[in-house]
Amino acid sequence: MLNAQQFLNQFSLEAPLDESLYPIIRDICQEVKVHGDKALKMYNLTFDHTKTDHLEISHEQIKAAFDTLDEKTKQALQQSYERIKAYQESIKQTNQQLEKSVECYEIYHPLESVGIYVPGGKASYPSTVLMTATLAQVAGVENIVVVTPPQPNGVSQEVLAACYITQVNQVFQVGGAQSIAALTYGTETIPKVDKIVGPGNQFVAYAKKYLFGQVGIDQIAGPTEIALIIDDTADLDAIVYDVFAQAEHDELARTYVISEDAQVLKDLESRITKALPNVDRYDIVSKSIANQHYLIHASNFDDACHVMNTIAPEHASIQTVNPQPYIEKVKYVGALFIGHYSPEVIGDYVAGPSHVLPTNRTARFTNGLSVNDFLTRNTVIHLSKDTFEQIADSAQHIAHVEALYNHQQSILIRQS
């Protein structure tokens, strides 16, 4: 256990990406750019140990995956989809009917094409399809393309069923940096897209960083993380599994628990130690807990909030007797979960907001994925002659001050 100042003194995040990967990523991207599908099939065999004669999964296969899915899973995916869709519709930026007197305003248009990366390494993630493709669908994106790593037994039925529910246009079995390159450049089979979203490993993250500018991206994702503020009213057995749930994603997953009550932290530590040997996915969870788990004793409310805002975690959970004051004070988090019945895991699947959230302190300056990330925003300036005449002198004078005389002349010629 550390006090807040001790934690802050030692707190630092390693660079989210391993710079030594740069030449590997560059070579993969160049290979895909030059050799297209041939390179993708080679990398499927090299990295995923899977021979893929056909990169695209047919619409018939996608529909069959949904049709033959067990009813309980189908209903769960459908409920998640409906909640995500309803929430995203409620926050979507829309074009407003404006009075004729309004001379400057904004209009929104959906992106034409989007690529979605769905991880497929240590687990199957139909939830990622729902938390990304639904947003693109609500935005009105014309062409939604999913890429996901090939598996020896094929792409998981649940992932394909989620693609069917969200009306994804095409699904390709290709993963890693090579899939990001394919979506950026286009190949004989995979279409070039305008933007790529979705979480992935370091190779995926670095490829997105490397190719940004040639294609839009959502973020450079690092290891997943959660920070919780708790007091003596929190259910510590539930907190144990809030911590384990995050830790089971990745050995590098980070978990932080903050409390003003040192005894609560000691009790929690004891329960984690007791439960750990029997936890599912022990190899992953135990490494995360051993290396990336922190118990932090805060001296007061402001101290706890300061620590939380410094961490700027992907997920923040407040489980205290009176969580309301934290809603305004905790400013820099990907998503804020309030109360005993709002565990972070519910946000992973069915709450409504996307689970694609900023990591590695990037919540200090960016936000979680939303429907509005699939829209362009254009400003429209349509001035009347009267308005032009009211402001033209100021504009042409500023142009003169900046010695941009053609700018100035563009205005003067209209005044004459």
Curated annotation (Swiss-Prot):
Binding positions for Zn(2+) per the UniProt entry: 246, 249, 348, 407
Keyword Oxidoreductase found: yes
Pathway assignment: Amino-acid biosynthesis; L-histidine biosynthesis; L-histidine from 5-phospho-alpha-D-ribose 1-diphosphate: step 9/9
GO cellular component: cytosol
E.C. designation(s): 1.1.1.23
Note on cofactor: Binds 1 zinc ion per subunit.
Residues that bind NAD(+): 117, 178, 201
Protease found in the keyword field: no
Binding annotation for substrate: 224, 246, 249, 315, 348, 402, 407
Principal EC category: oxidoreductase
Active site per database record: 314 (proton acceptor), 315 (proton acceptor)
Keyword list, A-Z: Amino-acid biosynthesis, Histidine biosynthesis, Metal-binding, NAD, Oxidoreductase, Zinc
Cofactor(s) needed: Zn(2+)
UniProt xrefs under PROSITE patterns: HISOL_DEHYDROGENASE (PS00611)
Reactions performed catalytically: L-histidinol + 2 NAD(+) + H2O = L-histidine + 2 NADH + 3 H(+)
GO biological process: L-histidine biosynthetic process
GO molecular-function term, one example from the UniProt record: NAD binding
Protein family (similarity comment): Belongs to the histidinol dehydrogenase family.
HAMAP family: HisD (MF_01024)
Protein role: Catalyzes the sequential NAD-dependent oxidations of L-histidinol to L-histidinaldehyde and then to L-histidine.
Name of the protein: Histidinol dehydrogenase
Record lineage: Bacteria, Bacillati, Bacillota, Bacilli, Bacillales
UniProt gene name: hisD
